Amino acid sequence: MDSTGASQIVSALDVIYSPKSNNSQRQEAQKFLDEVKLCSESPFWGYEIALQNPTNSILKYFGLGLLDHAVKKNWNDYDEGKRVALRKWVMELNFGVQDYDTRYIKEKLATLWVEVAKRTWGEALKQTNPTEEQLLTSWVDMDNNLFELWNINQSSRELALIIFRILFEDVFLLDDLIVLKRMTVIQPLCVMIVCPIEVFAIKYKFSDKWTKFKANEEGWFSVWIPELNNALQQNNSEYIIRLLETLKTCLNWPLTEVIVRNDVLSSLLTCLSSNIPRAQSMALDSIHILLTRPYSNESHYQMTIDRVFDNMDLLDSVYESLLFDPTDDIDETKYPIIKKFVDMISCLYVCVPKIKETNGQIQKYFKLVLKTTYNPSLIVSGLTLDLWCTCLRNDEYLPKLEKYVIPDLLQFAADALVYYEQIDGHISKKFAEIDFQSKSEFQTFCSTYRKRIRDIIRLISCVELDLTYDWLNNRLNNYFSSPFGQQVLSSTFLDHKLEPYLGALSQYMIVECFINGCIRWKIWYPTGDDYDEKLDSILQKLEILSNQLIALNLREPLLLKKQIQNFALFLTMLKDNVLFTLLEKIITSATMDYPEINLEERGAESDAVRDLRYACGIELNRMALLMPESLKKIYPDLESVIARIMPNLSYHEKISFKSFLLIIVLKSSLDMKEERFAAIVDPELLAWSDKTTVVGLSDLHWFMERLGIVQIAEYFQRRDIDENSDLLSIPIDDEGKELKSELTKRWQSLFPVRATRMFIHYSMQSIKTDEEFKMLQDLWRPRIVPILPYITRLLYQLQSYHDPDNWKGLPTVVQSFVKYSTIERFWEAGASNKSKDEFIDEHMKAMQTLRDFADSVGHIIRYTREYTLLVLSAISSLGSVFYLLDESPDLLLNSIAIFKPGSNEISPGVSTHGWKHIMNIAIRPILKGCPKDCLGKFMPAFLPKLFEILDLLLCQKWSSHMNDMDMNPVPTDDDQMTEEILEENLLRQLTTVVVRIVIDCVGQGNANPNSAKSRLNNHQMEMRKIIFNDLNTLAPFLKLLNHLISFKDTKCSFNSILVMKCCLTSVLNQNNTVDEYFTFEVMKNLLLNVLCNSAFKDSFHEALYAFTVIFLTLCKEYPSARAFLFEISNGYNIDELYRNLRSVDEYKTQRALMIDFIDWVKSTSGKEDGNVDHAGDERKRQEKREAILKKANERLIKKNKENGDMLDDPNIEDGAVGNLFDDN
């Protein structure tokens, strides 16, 4: 290409954008333009094109793109002359900006300016006595150039603002690698140019050479704020927005003296009261930043909050102006601003103790917050609920709350305690359509919202008990005397989506909150002189309330269930006064007859009755744990009553009542404990060694026969069902219903897992002494040791059931049926591709078809597996009974991980969801619950194989997800979720559980027990000794951890790197084999897969620190480590890098050197992002930048700030590096 390159580029662009060009011509032109960027003259052609085509945005933008490419990709290859020339071209183009230049042209011009500044500005300040030439190449007059640009015209002024905005974003908000390398110079320069020089001098020590980089003694704030005030007077909305865009980026980091001196807050409040929506939105963000940023000068903070509270009338009027009537439609302009407004207002409560109420400011503030709490949007209302809960927990706030808001807040909370998601046409659902992407999200939020509302009622009940009691009595009387209340009292079953049921449920929830408030009062008030007198009064009131509620003749099962749960709460306060009354009520409710309901069939009404009975069983057992001595007095009577009702109970209900008796036996001072224990427990445990059980567990086909699959197959044959039949379309007949009923009864007591789990679980509750624990071990040891092999064998068969290879000997129709039964049809918020209601509807329809057999068998398989896992977890709570048994580790691991001969496949067919349950329900509790005196025997036998299993399992499952996958997938509506997305989501959940297992073992905090920041518990400290001191355990642990770091899941990778960080000082330089693994596997993984991969950007800083520690440690000891890094870095001078790192003490400087190294590796290995700079790629990069900025801004304005940058903590970073690599 010759000197006419610019004209050739213009011609090529004409071809691309001409409607007359064909695809072949466009492709050829595009190929030419891609090659242009590789030419050394390309920046000059870009400058020429942009300069000579000022009104042609397409040509100008492409020309600027060539300059941008040159700065970003080739800057390090240019000598100082070329760099200065490039800078002058960029300045000339910026100085030539005009009104006709589009917004995106101005953004591109500003970006070019900033890209040059990030690479050169202030570089000479690293020298002690820089020369004039060095100052020139360091763009010493950039601040002056910006003032020149500011004064040209209105467009140049706007461009200057964009330059500042992008510069400050890159320096203070984004993790920009170019900035990170020059942070020690570029951050102080930014601070210096925005503030007066005497203010800068208070914080920073600097020499005269620094002042050469500053053009205006007063700084840019003194320019922007008067400019903003003038724009507000002229109502120049566009200019106001541009000024605020820049101001918003520089409120968190300048010295607070600048903020106060320029009265920034007053200008922001004026913006807030304007009628310019975008200005209001940005003003709210900016005020929020000012309220939550750190202040080194307390008086500056006080002045800021005083100014805000003095303007409560203004804030109130702003809120009123933002309100709209949602019945017609949601105002999508005002609604986001309302959310920001309330978010900002709700963070102000922390300032209340610092405010002197001279003009009713605090009253006005709480009244305003209460007004926002009443907002019909649950999101808006919900933003204030934590504020009320926090204030109600803090005695400092109570006098003001009692004075201004408590009665109104209590009334609101009671009225708001409803199931919004179940009320058709509720106004909150209009807002939910905007705020939530799926029904399940809305349902989850409603649950959280109700929890906060309940907390408010509970806390008010505690601090204003008499007021709440009178209010509650009045409310209950009014409700149950109303038509709805009368309907509730006269009905057996109610529609759970209509007002009579929902209204009554709300009343019972309020009663529950009140009782919990009374329970909290006992903890909160004991220091009062009149405590005993007040307590007697409260107990009297509770007894009256309890008797009134018992007198209500409820039969609706789910309302009765709620009433029973409330009675159990009454018992915690009233104890013996109401024990027998409530006990009678619970037993009566548990055995209440519903003659119109067939409990053998599945349906909403029969499910409700079962739910009631299950709840009664739980509350009985809680009663026994709470008051065993009181119940001991009537134990013979209880035995007789329960013996009489046993024949009428289901198997599950029988176990609940037996558990009730067992608790009284074990927890009271009742005599003949061993005999009574044996009489209750042994008949159930004998089923484990029953001949039919032993045979059923010995072979998978026998196991399937025990499940009833043979009978189902015979029934299918009689109905001519084959493997091609659609079970969901074939209705179940009378014979099928009879078979299903028979199997259901069999499945209840198929294996004694539920009885075993409940008996052990309740035995181990409320243990008060070591003697009691030893007594329980002695009772359980002779019973557990013989049956443990049967329990684990059951788990083995449950795992084997899912393997298709194990079905091969079965008839084809049976294979098809078993396959159906292994399909998991569960509903899980955020994971299922249907709403909960849709899932239930489909399940109910399936119950009338032959698919119900497959669903039911699948359910009993999963239910039995879950209870078997719970049994193992419960057994582990017996301590040495489980952990000191030689066979325990192998029995457990061999039952869950079945290896296919000749392959590494583990338990084929077991779903990701199933594995998550296995790890959560059994493995984690077993790992965390091991007593200290059992660790040395159990863990070396258990951990190596466990880590190997987890590593193989996750690597197999992640193998198909590791290419081109988003680290943070965009949330998708349930209806759009494919099976692949569902599986990926479940895999992330499983991986999270595995990361938690790793953290359970070795922790994530500082390993130094003397450190103030040590977050390791005693169990983790002991586990670390076992893992780190045994190579057989450490090797699979490190292999698993290294893989966890590389899986493309943001949280998983980040947390795994934190684990790796906290292990380094304990494992490096201890063993040559381990150091070799770190060299050839861990460092390679961190460098090439994490640090050079933008997908791991959230883990970058932690990974960089870990890599630096490993690098410095191993390069000091092993020449082979340096040679290997030289090889994989494509020839970087590793020896020089090591020397440079060792020559500096501060980690920030080490970090800059490492970033240079990573840049080299990325550029030489082709891992740099954006090598092809098409318009689409540019747009994607801009969208990515905006997304990162959005996250950064959210962190900036959130209420609870991080306590500084962890990397700035000398105890963590510099100190750790310094100590670790000390030569002495």
UniProtKB/Swiss-Prot annotation:
Region (Disordered), start-end ranges: 1200-1224
Assembly behavior: Interacts with CEX1.
One term under GO cellular component: nucleus
Xref: PANTHER family: EXPORTIN 1/5, EXPORTIN-5
Additional observations: Present with 3500 molecules/cell in log phase SD medium.
Domain of life: Eukaryota
GO terms, molecular function: nuclear export signal receptor activity; RNA binding
SUPFAM superfamilies associated with the record: ARM repeat (SSF48371)
A GO BP annotation: RNA export from nucleus
Lineage start: Eukaryota, Fungi, Dikarya, Ascomycota, Saccharomycotina
Name assigned to this protein: Protein MSN5
Gene3D superfamilies named among the record's database cross-references: Leucine-rich Repeat Variant
InterPro entries given in the database record: ARM-like, ARM-type_fold, Exportin-5_C, XPO1/5
